Amino acid sequence: MPNGYIRQRLTEAAEEATDRVEEARTAPSRLVALNKLQWAQSEARYAAAGWAFVDRGLAEAELRSEHQAIVSEANSFDSEFAYLGTDPITASLVYGQAERFLDSVLDDGRTPTSRKSSQLLTVAEWGDHVETARVQLDDARYLYDRYQSTLPDDAGSVADTLSTAVETLRSDLQHRRKGLPEAPTDDDNRLRWRLRDDIRSNAESSVDRVDEAPGPATALSMATRGLTALLAHDRLTDRLEDGETFGVETAADVRDARTAAVDAITAALDESPRTALVRPILADAARSVSFADDRLAAFDGDVRPSRLDHPIVEYTAATLRARSVPAASETVLDALDT
């Protein structure tokens, strides 16, 4: 029988699975619910594998074999992956998520560590590992099959359209990245330094994210994010050159920074020609606002302005990115049309 600590870990995993199922019931979108259920299934398998070790002697080797079979299935699915569609934007969004789920199975370098102190926990972790691969493969197939079932019989491939657009956008991103000005080394303003570092790091990695994408659909999404990041950097540079300090002294200044971020996100949703293309980027911007809100909520009483740097960076970065979204989406659509 497992000792108290191990029994607690198995119980906690089962409880975690139950909690994630409940969260899935009230998730704001089906994709969020799907991710919650993936988490729930992995936690449930962790607990089940641990108890199976006790009840019937489930071995690590059996789970390794099961994982190898799943990877083999994933390779077969990957070799048959066809980018059928009638609209490259919609196709890229669905296939992109399927690509990422599939890539998580095929390119997962994590392997559960063999615990000499507890073979039971090793088996439990392998159960989690196996189930994570299984549900991601199943969900990739589900999204793929569900989307293709909506297509007309004469739907053609959008693979070339996506790949050509990605190459055009990659060249654009490379050109823009080369044009990034050198970051100043004599600015001792911590707020400006943090903001510049946050925006610049995203801009500099823009091409890498496209190159590392598991397929053309994800690459298009990464190119859209990259363009947004580079345009946001341009906006930041312009504001810094105009003498903007981004500093705050009063609660009203903080409120104005937050309002600007929320308004920018709302405006981007209205102004972007294909909202679905940029919604993930704007969702990230909204999360930045939420993170800043949580940080502010933790303060109590009088607060020194320097302690507001983190939320102000979050609000300002969200504003810069959201305001850059419409132009980025226009550039992506132009690339798809050529």
Segments from the language model and where they lie:
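Extracellular/lumenal glycan-associated context and N-glycosylation machinery
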Residues: 1-338
